[in-house]
Amino acid sequence: MTDTLELVRTLSDTEWAELAGRLLTGWFPRGRDTQRRPAGDWSVWLILTGRGWGKTRTGSEDLVDAAITQPGDYAVVAPTFGDARDVCVEGPSGIISVLNRRCVAHNWNRSLGEIALANGSRIKVGSADEPDRWRGWNFRGGWCDELGAWRRPDAWTQLRLATRIGDRPRLVVTTTPRPTTLLKDLVGRTDGSVYVTRGATWENEANLSPAALDELRTRYGGTRIGRQELEGELLLDTPGALWSLAQFDAPGFRAAEAD
């Protein structure tokens, strides 16, 4: 007990805030390891997983953690404002639910699309369909939901340009994989700036309907849509194409080099 008290006395205000947030929510012991922010010097955490994996809850918990422990402005961007409001903010796994569970005082201004916390943090909620609305902001971080469904990839550019405050501004991306140019670029980064978490729907079976999972396995198991939407696989081949990327890379496909 003495050692524990000594440890508690050494906690900084920021560490106290983080500990309190985790203890109040119950997320720390229940969330899977892959749902917790990874260590490292990354700028983008790309969560590329199947439906029902727990992307929304992960994005909400991570953003609330950041807003509590590092006061500042944060962004939440989804394909449309309705998606951001109904899923990321007001949904059962959304930000409001997480804030209420943690007993964190907040004010959600629905008309402005803005959540204000008592510590001064602001969470700006908006749409990827309006990229110019992200000009002029100075964000510490943000959450980008369903990046694979964004119709305006320049929204990502504007958000990256606006995320520039703090020692390490970071963006968390939660999306079901689609072979867009932007997602393929992020997955292909080799400089350590992007940390990729992959996962399948089945990893969250404890929180999903067994009957629904059985039906999904039966109907979509082994199919192209199942590989993308359930297994979380980024499919780079074009359906119906004469050749696939895997065939090009197969042993014996390429001609041997001349001596």
Predicted regions and their residues:
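ATPase catalytic-site recognition across NTP-hydrolyzing enzymes
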Residues: E205-D259
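Pre-P-loop entry segment of helicase/translocase ATPase cores
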Residues: M1-V44
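ASCE P-loop NTPase helicase motor core
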Residues: A149-G221
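Walker A/P-loop NTP-binding motif
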Residues: T56-P71
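Short hydrophobic/aromatic beta-strand immediately N-terminal to the Walker A/P-loop
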Residues: W45-L48, A75
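Inter-Walker segment of RecA-like/P-loop motor cores
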Residues: G82-R140, L234
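Conserved RecA-like ASCE P-loop NTPase motor core of nucleic-acid helicases/translocases
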Residues: G72-A84
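Walker B catalytic acidic pair
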Residues: D145-L147
